A protein has these predicted regions:
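Short connector loops at helix/strand junctions that flank enzyme active sites
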Residues: 7, 15, 32, 37, ...
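Active-site-adjacent beta-strand/loop module that shapes the phosphate/pyrophosphate-binding cleft
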Residues: 16, 75-98, 128-132, 136
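A short beta-turn/loop motif at secondary-structure boundaries
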Residues: 29, 77-81, 103-104, 146
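Acidic/histidine-enriched, glycine/proline-rich intrinsically disordered or flexible terminal extensions
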Residues: 134-146
Length: 146
């Protein structure tokens, strides 16, 4: 029997007034063409905070201090091949201006009204952004019966 191990990922919510920063995925093999948040996997031996800081700098060129990150939501989800635990962090201040640092994996950036996300936003991202307004935890594709 193989040992079950979910993948841990971080999502970074960067706000500007009532808008959030989205990036459009490309050349990744997963949801290419769809809008999402800056995000990535937590590497072996890395804390979730460190991963969020690293991903923000790698993907959008901003520098975030650990004290500027607030954990606002946890999503436990199952995709076709993997199970994820996604930690969603909201950013309260950063240095720099968001720019597309990975044009090979990101077609562009945009600021979007949270209440009017693009039609082609990743479905689980839309669900999580809506759900986190009233809850701190959600699950998708899993047995939720108690």
């Amino acid at each position: 029997m193989s040992k079950f191990r979910p993948f841990l990922a971080v999502y970074i919510i960067v706000r500007q007034q009532q808008r959030i920063l989205l990036l459009q995925r490309q050349n990744t093999g997963f949801d290419d063409g769809k809008w999402s948040l800056p995000a990535g996997h937590v590497e072996e031996g890395e804390s979730a905070l460190t991963a969020a800081i690293r991903e923000a700098e790698e993907e959008i060129g901003i520098v975030i201090s650990p004290s500027a990150l607030k954990l606002v939501y946890t999503l436990h989800r199952k995709s076709d091949e993997r199970t994820y635990i996604d930690l969603w962090f909201e950013v309260d201040g950063f240095d720099g201006v968001p720019v597309n640092q990975e044009p090979n994996k990101c077609a562009g950036l945009m600021w979007s009204d949270l209440q009017n996300l693009p039609e082609n936003t990743q479905e689980y991202v839309k669900i999580a952004l809506k759900d986190m307004q009233t809850s701190h935890y959600g699950s998708l594709g899993l047995d939720t019966e108690c």
